[in-house]
Amino acid sequence: VMSQRFFDAMGATRVHRHLCGVTAWLGAADVHGVPLGMDPEDLRHSRTILLWGTNTLVTNRHLWPTIEAARAEGAVVVVVDPVRTTTAERADRHVQLRPGSDVALVLGMLHVIDRDGLVDRAFLEDHTSGWDELLADARRVDLDATATITGIDVATIEWLATTFATRRPAAVRVLVGLEHRQHGQEAHRALAMLPAVTGAWRERGGGLCRSTQQ
């Protein structure tokens, strides 16, 4: 095959690194203990779906009917992406953050969720550790600074956080968009914390949807 001929010409037998997948696996595993997420088919039960850094309609087309089925039952679909993709045009709302500002946006959302009393403390106490340190960091976030970093106004950050925490079941769907950049693992770690802090994992259709295999 062409790729083998290319590596033969370089004198190499294989690429001794991973281009993307391990970034997401390690980020999710840092939070969940394993790199797996919710079953994508369960998105049909979601009432909030954040498509974060994924042009689902083009690169994950077989999942789109599931998302449309959820919309038919009242789900709101939000695309979080620096690019105005085909999926963003079809979504209910497009949150167009600056490239590389994902962690800042998540921390801003966590600040709002904590500030407004939307943290599921019972879930955190029963199923997690270190959450108090996380929320202490989130409380120090300045939303005006977050708006400057992300290019998203404070009202939109508050809307996104409140919608995810209260319009349930709520899920985040990520694919390779966050992996093909510097600090992608940290972005995946941050996103994995969102459904834990709100207790989204309690419900079918809630959680983080990324990989279904290890």
Could you say what each language-model-derived stretch is?
Residues 1-214:
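Catalytic alpha/large subunits of respiratory electron-transfer oxidoreductases
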